[in-house]
């Protein structure tokens, strides 16, 4: 099956582990989920035939859960527990680790300078963002007022883009979250945590941008 003309967001939802494959190629399937596979492959200099073959292989596996068929209230409850609560745990710990690494290894050329600042900015951005969703947008959607939520949803999508930009900066200062040979245990653990946080955040944003918000605006 040809996947090149399909949006990344749709492919991430319909093919098991496609999201992990897109992350491997540094393709943005959450905020950039409307771009086609062909366009993303061109932008990242990826052979379209190779990635299509990889997706075809993944598509043979059963999908764990098709969120496109799950009631909106259940999706919201899942987002809060699986992603919002998790981000609230992840980021403070990562900030502590980054503070230590930047202080202890200040003289190392590969130290991720500014990482603490950017993680703190992401934490503040997401804390405000998630609170607005939980207090304003999610109750509207649960009450069947999704059609009237155009304004709040537009703001949330814009804030998703801002979070994505901060993630790009974090990836830049960490050499794409790759620890150097001299990295200590804390440094390596922090990078593992950052990679996990980025995976979670991309899944989180994709579920909202590509499933929850469109269905809410359609009046479900």
Curated annotation (Swiss-Prot):
The UniProt entry's GO CC annotations, sorted and at most eight, read: cytoplasm
The alphabetized list of GO BP terms reads: protein repair; response to nitrosative stress; response to oxidative stress
* Name the record gives this protein: Iron-sulfur cluster repair protein YtfE
Question: Which GO molecular function entries does the Swiss-Prot or TrEMBL record give?
Answer: metal ion binding
User: Which Pfam families does this chain map to?
Assistant: Hemerythrin, ScdA_N
Q: Where in the cell is it found?
A: Cytoplasm
Q: Which domain of life is it from?
A: Bacteria
| Family the UniProt entry places it in | Belongs to the RIC family. YtfE subfamily.
Annotated InterPro entries: FeS-repair_YftE, Hemerythrin-like, RIC_family
Task: Give the species this sequence originates from.
Answer: Salmonella choleraesuis (strain SC-B67)
Query: Which residue pairs form cystines in this protein?
Result: none
């Amino acid at each position: 099956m040809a996947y090149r003309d399909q949006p990344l967001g749709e492919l991430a939802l319909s093919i098991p582990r496609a999201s992990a494959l897109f992350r491997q190629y540094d393709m943005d399937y959450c905020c950039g989920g409307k771009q086609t596979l062909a366009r993303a492959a061109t932008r990242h200099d990826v052979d379209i035939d190779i990635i299509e073959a990889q997706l075809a292989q993944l598509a043979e596996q059963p999908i764990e859960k098709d969120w496109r068929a799950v009631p909106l209230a259940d999706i919201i409850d899942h987002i809060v527990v699986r992603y919002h609560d998790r981000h609230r745990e992840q980021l403070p710990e990562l900030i502590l680790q980054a503070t230590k690494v930047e202080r202890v290894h200040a003289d190392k050329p590969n130290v991720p300078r500014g990482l603490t600042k950017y993680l703190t900015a992401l934490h503040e951005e997401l804390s405000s963002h998630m609170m607005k969703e939980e207090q304003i947008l999610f109750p509207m959607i649960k009450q069947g007022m999704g059609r009237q939520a155009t304004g709040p949803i537009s703001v949330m999508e814009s804030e998703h883009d801002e979070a994505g930009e901060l993630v790009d900066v974090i990836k830049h200062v960490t050499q794409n979250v790759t620890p150097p040979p001299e990295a200590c245990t804390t440094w390596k653990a922090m990078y593992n945590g950052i990679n996990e946080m980025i995976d979670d955040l991309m899944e989180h944003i994709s579920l909202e941008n590509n499933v929850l918000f469109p269905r809410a605006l359609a009046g479900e």
